[in-house]
From Swiss-Prot:
SMART domains: B_lectin. Residues 88-193 form the Bulb-type lectin domain. It comes from Daucus carota (Wild carrot). In 14-day old seedlings, expressed in the epidermis and apical dome of the shoot and in the hypocotyl, cotyledon and epidermis of the root. In developing seeds, expressed in both the inner and outer epidermis of the integument. This is Epidermis-specific secreted glycoprotein EP1. GO terms for biological process: water transport. One of its GO terms (cellular component) is plant-type cell wall. PANTHER family: BULB-TYPE LECTIN DOMAIN-CONTAINING PROTEIN, CURCULIN-LIKE (MANNOSE-BINDING) LECTIN FAMILY PROTEIN-RELATED. Its main location: secreted. One of its GO terms (molecular function) is carbohydrate binding.
Length: 389
C-alpha cells in the first residue's frame, strides 16, 4: 500500500486545490456590470471615433467602448488625459473585427470571468477565467489590465493579447502571440494586410496582397538577422531604460531573448525625457512608429519619437548615435505608390502613358493590363519633347 501513497496524496491535493478555487469568489464590491448606453465622450480620440469611458482607470489609461459607426463598438484601453487636450489613443482592443452593439454589456462576476456580450446575450469575447481563483481586476501604471488571485498572481493579462501595439514592457513570445497585425483603415476596425512577426531567426514585416495566398516580406530588423545558427528567438519586448544614473537620457529599444543566451537589444532611439509612457505600433500603411506621451504638459502631449520608414533621411545632427536600427526610406512600404509601385527617394514616379507623355503620379496610376505574356503584348513607347545635350 505504501507505494500508492504519493499518487493518492497528489490526487487529494489536486481536489483540495480545486475546492479552494471553487470557493474563491470576487468580493461583491469588486464585481461590476457596465451597459453600453448613455452619453458619449466629449474629447477627440484616435480614428475620430465616439467613445464611452468605463470605471476601470489608472492614469493615463482607461477602459472604454469606442466606435466609428453607431452599431459597432470595440472594448479598448485608451491612453491619454483630458487635461492635456491631446488626442486619446487606443493601445489595446479586446474584440477587433467582432464588434458589439448599443446596450452590450461588460460583466465581471463573482466567478472571476470578464465577459463582453451583445445586447441579445451572445458572448463576443471573454477572458475564460471562471472559477480559477480570480479575486480582482485592475489596470497597472504601464497599461497592462490584469485579473489576479489572492496572492497577486496574474491569471490573465491584456499584455498577452496585443493587436497592433506594444506598450513598454509588452512582448511577443514563442508559444503565445508572436505578431502584431495592422488595422485595415481608420474607419474599418478589422485586421489589415500588414504584420510584424517574430520568427525563430528574426523579426520581419510582411504584406499580404489580396491577389496572393502568401505574404511578402518587405523588411527585416537588422540586429535579429545576426543570430547564431544554433539559437532562436524566444521573445521580443518593447522597453525603455535610463541611459545612465543621472537620468538625462532614455533609450527606447526592442530587447530579445534567445534559446541559449540572454539575448540583446536593438536600440531604436535616444530621448531627452522620460519615455515610460510610450508604445510601438504597426501602422495602417505598414510603417512602424513609436508614440511617446508626456503627462507633464497641458498641450501637445504626444510626440512621434521613432519612425522606421521616413519620407527623407533625418539631418545628421538629429541621428541618434545610440540607435542600432536606423530609419529607412518610405519607398520600402509595399503600397507607398499604389499599384504602379515605382518609387525613388521617397517620391512616386510619374505615370507614363501610351501616347508618350509622363503624367504626375496619382493613386490611379497602375501598370497596363496584359492579355497574355506573348511577345506581341510588349512594346516601347516613344517619349517626345526631350532635348539631348
Amino acid at each position: 500500500m505504501a507505494r500508492f501513497f504519493p499518487l493518492t496524496l497528489t490526487i487529494l491535493l489536486f481536489f483540495i486545490q480545486r475546492i479552494d478555487f471553487c470557493h474563491t469568489l470576487v468580493p461583491a464590491n469588486e464585481t461590476f456590470k457596465f451597459v453600453n448606453e448613455g452619453e458619449l465622450g466629449q474629447y477627440i480620440s484616435e480614428y475620430f471615433g465616439d467613445y464611452r469611458p468605463l470605471d476601470p482607470f489608472t492614469s493615463p489609461f482607461q477602459l472604454c467602448f469606442y466606435n466609428q459607426t453607431p452599431t459597432a463598438f470595440t472594448l479598448a484601453l485608451r491612453m491619454g488625459l483630458r487635461r492635456t487636450e491631446s488626442l486619446m489613443r487606443w493601445v489595446w482592443e479586446a474584440n477587433r473585427g467582432n464588434p458589439v452593439d448599443e446596450n452590450a454589456t461588460l460583466t465581471f462576476g463573482p466567478d472571476g470571468n470578464l465577459v463582453l456580450a451583445r445586447s441579445n446575450g451572445q458572448v463576443a469575447w471573454q477572458t475564460s477565467t471562471a472559477n480559477k481563483g480570480v479575486v480582482g481586476l485592475k489596470i497597472l501604471p504601464n497599461g497592462n489590465m490584469v485579473l489576479y488571485d489572492s496572492k497577486g498572481k496574474f491569471l490573465w493579462q491584456s499584455f498577452d493579447t496585443p493587436t497592433d501595439t506594444l506598450l513598454v514592457g509588452q512582448s511577443l513570445k514563442m508559444g503565445a502571440v508572436t505578431k502584431l497585425v495592422s488595422r485595415a483603415s481608420p474607419g474599418e476596425n478589422v485586421n489589415g494586410p500588414y504584420s510584424l512577426v517574430m520568427e525563430p531567426k528574426g523579426l520581419h514585416l510582411y504584406y499580404k496582397p489580396t491577389t496572393s495566398p502568401k505574404p511578402i516580406r518587405y523588411y527585416s530588423f537588422s540586429l535579429f538577422t545576426k543570430l547564431n545558427k544554433n539559437e532562436s528567438l524566444q521573445n521580443v519586448t518593447f522597453e525603455f531604460e535610463n541611459e545612465n544614473d543621472q537620468g538625462f537620457a532614455f533609450l527606447l529599444s526592442l530587447k530579445y531573448g534567445t534559446s541559449n543566451s540572454l539575448g540583446g537589444a536593438s536600440i531604436l532611439n535616444r530621448i531627452k525625457y522620460n519615455t515610460t509612457l510610450s508604445f510601438l505600433r504597426l501602422e495602417i500603411d505598414g510603417n512602424v512608429k513609436i508614440y511617446t506621451y508626456n503627462d507633464k504638459v497641458d498641450y501637445g502631449a504626444w510626440e512621434v519619437t521613432y519612425t522606421l520608414f521616413l519620407k527623407a533621411p533625418p539631418p545628421l545632427f538629429q541621428v541618434s548615435l545610440a540607435a542600432t536600427e536606423s530609419e529607412s526610406s518610405e519607398c520600402q512600404l509595399p503600397k507607398k505608390c499604389g499599384n504602379f509601385g515605382l518609387c525613388e527617394e521617397s517620391q512616386c514616379v510619374g505615370c507614363p502613358t501610351s501616347s508618350g507623355p509622363v503624367l504626375a503620379w496619382s493613386k490611379t496610376c497602375e501598370p497596363p493590363k496584359l492579355s497574355s505574356c506573348g511577345p506581341k503584348d510588349f512594346h516601347y513607347n516613344k517619349l517626345g519633347g526631350w532635348i539631348t545635350t
